[in-house]
Amino acid sequence: MRRSGSAWWNTWNAYDASFSYMLPVKRGEPGQLLSSMRFHTSLLLAILLALATLQGCSLLRLGYGQLDHIAAWMADDYFDLDHQQKDEFHKRFARLHEWHRYEQLPDYAAFLRDIRGRVEKGLAREDVVWVAEGVRARYRTLARHGADDAATLLLTITPQQIEALKRQWGKDNRKFIREHKLDGTPQERQRARVKRALDQVTDWVGSLTPEQEERIAALVTAAPSIQPLRHEDRRRRQREFLALLEQRANPAEFPARLRDWLIDWEKGRAPQYQRLQPEAWENRIAFLVAVDRMLTPHQRATLTRRLQSYIDDFTRLAERRGAQTTAQ
């Protein structure tokens, strides 16, 4: 029996929309990872985001320690891997995991420390832009490092496994439509947007006052919705990935093509979506700055404590095993 990994894969929404939304994932409700199917480089980033929704530091550390098993489970859920492919996935992902843990997590901790410092002072427009650029840079580092191994694995994917992937994508797309009320009335879509924003803010800063909720709802309502275009862009990325798999006849060129596709993920957007991106991004910046300015001292302290908990987790995870034993 195949297992459902959609909840884990769905973490991609937090990254896929990070440059137009830049709000962390809601605890217990990760976003949509497979919207663009960046396979095993995005897989690592997505699981990190999913682990960040766990309650408590020890759970995050436990989840990251089992990352290779979680990743294999997720890949199998989408591709229905055979035994040989699973073994190869474990071997290659273990190398990526080792590199990421000891080379990248210290940088993530430093990045979060800088974010925490900016949050403590109060966010300005340039701070939000800086965070977005930092996320982009770290994604590209991950994509460049993992693209060759991902390409090697993708060369083994069969037509039957591609059909399994399409079926799983169909489920993901239907879930996106359902959660964002794309098949509902404009009023239903608006209510869903407001609820999602309130849930995300509350998850990071704690309870909101009625006045804050009203102000946040007004900010969301004032900004035009681009969810239908986002959905179409997800499907565009899925089509591109399938087209990329058709180019595997030349194994020597495929890794470079995959790497370019992973990094230039905005290339090929529909003209209307591309045209609206600058406005959507500016709206999101204004939203985040406005929310930051309405935070009470207690809410700001809640946010900085949560950021610090992730800093502590990443720092501890990046310690070599010998150092951890000594510290204990």
Identify the meaning behind each predicted range.
Residues 58-60:
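Bacterial signal peptide processing site
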Residues 65-97:
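Start-of-domain marker
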